[in-house]
Amino acid sequence: MAVRIKLKPGREKSLERRHPWVFSNGIHNVKGKLEPGDTVDVVAHDGHWLGRGAWSPESQIQVRIWTFDREEEIDREFFKRRILRAQAGRDDLIREQGLTGYRLIAAESDGLPGITIDKYANVLVCQLLSMGADVWRDTIVDVLAELYPDCAIYERSDVDSRKKEGLASTMGLLHGSLPEMPVIIEENGIKIAVDVTKGHKTGFYLDQRDNRAMAARFVKGKSVLNCFCYTGTFGLYAAKAGAASIENVDVSALALDTARLNMRVNGLNDDNVHYNEADVFKLLRQYRDEGKTFDVIVLDPPKFADNKSQLNGACRGYKDINMIALQLLNPGGVLLTFSCSGLMPADLFQKIVADAALDAKREIQFIERLSQASDHPIGSAFPEGFYLKGLVARVW
């Protein structure tokens, strides 16, 4: 029988709506002896059963719910069922877009809190970000090895958020033999080089797939400035769509080298592509001072806010960079701008860009609102899963 955790009066409402987190300040008491990662039953103050999850005593989120089904045990078969369901939910997308790289498990939104798994061709990359996920590591790897026998399994749990769970950063091979890096994945007929050992996150930003395709609609015969380009995939889509010129900007020389490789593996000539190792904030100001302009600008910056205390600063940062980008666009040009900060509400992000347009003395029209690709689902009871917000604006 699992240890029981009783909530304070009135703190059961979020779990009754199937939100999977129990915060430390909502717990009344713990009945039984617990080790970190142990499975616990959560009950309301009046004793009625709410859910079954993993105990994480050092985290502000002290329980992450595995299941809201009282009859469901947390064992190897549980993880196998969840992974099979997630794969089935992505099969149509894989066929439609010809994907060999996709998100297999999107943590809470796939019913596996703290677990992210991305598939890059014949490599599965895991991030285990919670105590419960860490404790079940061997079982998760065993299930993946059964379901994907031709895949190597590599861990990229080298993230600061593990510290909040009392866990050390870790990465390395968990199963099989890792192929030579980079691996090549495909999406929408485009090949992309991914280094799962050195790349950002698990190796690549799969969540922007649909937005890369969206951007390609606006670039034929146009000049494109691709800011925070990482491995240049917005620029890659633009090159294939017939952009007249492309400038890929990133502070990482390694990322720009991969951007060049991506052009080569797709058989594309990059004579009209400029690779600029530079600080985007400084470069945009320089271009404004020089009077340089573009037809299309992509702004895909890193996360500006990791916690609520940083949100005001993030708002100022987003407003500043969007204002300068708007000043660099030719009349009739297009801005594609993104925020990957989960704490940034979509409506607030749109207001920030609108305010930036006022300061830039430019008239804009919002023509698309963008989000993460559909292999990054948002659980109906887990709005925190909606983290990527994007806007397409026509600029006059």
From Swiss-Prot:
Record field: catalytic activity: cytidine(1962) in 23S rRNA + S-adenosyl-L-methionine = 5-methylcytidine(1962) in 23S rRNA + S-adenosyl-L-homocysteine + H(+)
| PANTHER family associated with the record | RIBOSOMAL RNA LARGE SUBUNIT METHYLTRANSFERASE (PTHR42873), S-ADENOSYLMETHIONINE-DEPENDENT METHYLTRANSFERASE DOMAIN-CONTAINING PROTEIN (PTHR42873:SF1)
Q: What is the purpose of this protein?
A: Specifically methylates the cytosine at position 1962 (m5C1962) of 23S rRNA.
- What GO molecular functions are on record for this protein? RNA binding; rRNA (cytosine) methyltransferase activity
Q: What is its EC number?
A: 2.1.1.191
Q: Which organism is it from?
A: Shewanella sp. (strain MR-7)
This one is known as: Ribosomal RNA large subunit methyltransferase I
> May I have one GO cellular component term?
cytoplasm
Give the family, as the similarity comment puts it. Answer: Belongs to the methyltransferase superfamily. RlmI family.
Gene behind this protein: rlmI
The alphabetical list of record keywords is: Cytoplasm, Methyltransferase, RNA-binding, rRNA processing, S-adenosyl-L-methionine, Transferase
Pfam families xrefs: Methyltrans_SAM (PF10672), PUA_3 (PF17785)
Annotated PUA domain ranges read 2-79
Protein's cellular compartments: Cytoplasm
